[in-house]
Amino acid sequence: MFENITAAPADPILGLADLFRADDRPGKINLGIGVYKDETGKTPVLTSVKKAEQYLLENETTKNYLGIDGIPEFARCTQELLFGKGSALINDKRARTAQTPGGTGALRIAADFLAKNTPVKRVWVSNPSWPNHKSVFNAAGLEVREYAYYDAENHSLDFEALQASLSEAQAGDVVLFHGCCHNPTGIDPTLEQWQVLAELSVEKGWLPLFDFAYQGFARGLEEDAEGLRAFAALHKELIVASSYSKNFGLYNERVGACTLVAADAETVDRAFSQMKSAIRANYSNPPAHGASIVATILSNDALRAIWEQELTDMRQRIQRMRQLFVNTLQEKGANRDFSFIIKQNGMFSFSGLTKDQVLRLREEFGVYAVASGRVNVAGMTPDNMAPLCEAIVAVL
C-alpha cells in the first residue's frame, strides 16, 4: 500500500534548515527560517520566560488535561493583547479564544471551522505570502486566491493594485491580512490604509482573518495592533490566528491562539462550540507548558515589564541590523540601492535577490536564504555582516 506513495517536495523553509544543518562549512550563515537570534547568533530563552518557568516548576500542582480550548487566563491575556485593555468587544463578551499548537494550529482550526460550519469556499491571501498559508487552507478543502500586494520595482506596498485585485473577492469570501511585519516583504499598510481596508471589507461583506505572528516586532505592542483594531471597531465578525513563538521566543513550545469574534455573546458561544468540536477531532486539547508561561508573564506586572523590555531589545536589535546591512552593502560596493530595507518591519526583508542569486549564495558562500529572496534580518550579527554582504555583492 505504501510502496506507491511518491515523496513530498521539501518544505521551502524548514527544508532549508535541514540543508543548513548538513553543511559543514564553518562560516555558513542561516537567513532562512524565521527565528530571532541575538548578537552571538544564538536563539536565547528570554529572562522573563526563565523566571516564569521557575515559578511554574515550584507552583504547578498537576499535569492533568487542559480543557479543549486551553487555559482560561491565557485566553483572557491574549484578547487584551489583541484588542486592548478595556476593549468594548471584550466587555461585551463578543470574543472567544482557543489556545492552539502554534499559529499554524490556529490557522488550521480556523480553516476547518469555516469549511465545516459556514458557506465559505474561498480564502484570499497576499502575493507574496507565507508559503504555508496555501497548504493549510487547501488541506481544509478551501480554494486559495491571491491578491496583489508588493510593488517589486519600488519595494513598497502597491495599494492600488491590492484594492483592484480584491474587487474580485465576493461577499462571504475570507480575506487574510498579516497583522503586522508582513511575511515575507516586511511592508505593512499605514493606519490610513488599514482604515480604508476595514471600511472596504465591511462594505463588500468579506470575513477578515488576521494572521498575527509578530506583535511587538514592528513598532510596539499597541502600535502593531492598530490595523486589527481598526477592523474590530467596524466588523461584527472576524477571526485572529496569533502566535507567541516570536515575541516570547517560545518556538518549540508551539503556543498559538485562535480568536473568534461575533456580533454578540450568544452567537460567539454557539459558533465557538463548533470550533471546539473541530479541535476535539484534531488534537483533543492543547499542551500546557508554553501557554502557562505566557499567561504567567502577562498577568504578573513585574514579569511583564521584563518581557516588554526584552521585546523592545529584540525589535531594536533587528532595526540596528537593517541599518548595518544597508551600510555594509554600500561599503562593499553594491551596485544598487538597498535603502528600502531600512523601512521594512519585523524579522524579514524582501531583498530583491533572484532565485539564481539565492542558489549561488548557498552553493558558493554557505549563505542560506529562501528562494523568494526573503532574508531573516534577525539572523544577521555584527560578526557575520561583512562576509554576508561580500557574498551578496559577488552574486549581484
UniProtKB/Swiss-Prot annotation:
Subcellular locations according to the entry: Cytoplasm
An annotated GO cellular component: cytosol
Cofactors demanded by this protein: pyridoxal 5'-phosphate
GO biological process, one term: L-phenylalanine biosynthetic process from chorismate via phenylpyruvate
Alphabetized GO MF terms: identical protein binding; L-aspartate:2-oxoglutarate aminotransferase activity; L-tyrosine-2-oxoglutarate transaminase activity; pyridoxal phosphate binding
Key words of the record: Aminotransferase, Cytoplasm, Pyridoxal phosphate, Transferase
Entry's EC annotation: 2.6.1.1
Database matches in Pfam families: Aminotran_1_2
InterPro entries xref list: Aminotransferase_I/II_large (IPR004839), Asp_trans (IPR000796), NHTrfase_class1_PyrdxlP-BS (IPR004838), PyrdxlP-dep_Trfase (IPR015424), PyrdxlP-dep_Trfase_major (IPR015421), PyrdxlP-dep_Trfase_small (IPR015422)
Annotated positions binding L-aspartate: G34, W130, N183, R374
Residue(s) carrying N6-(pyridoxal phosphate)lysine: K246
Record-stated family: Belongs to the class-I pyridoxal-phosphate-dependent aminotransferase family.
The protein's assembly and partners: Homodimer.
UniProt name for this protein: Aspartate aminotransferase
Source organism (scientific name): Salmonella typhi
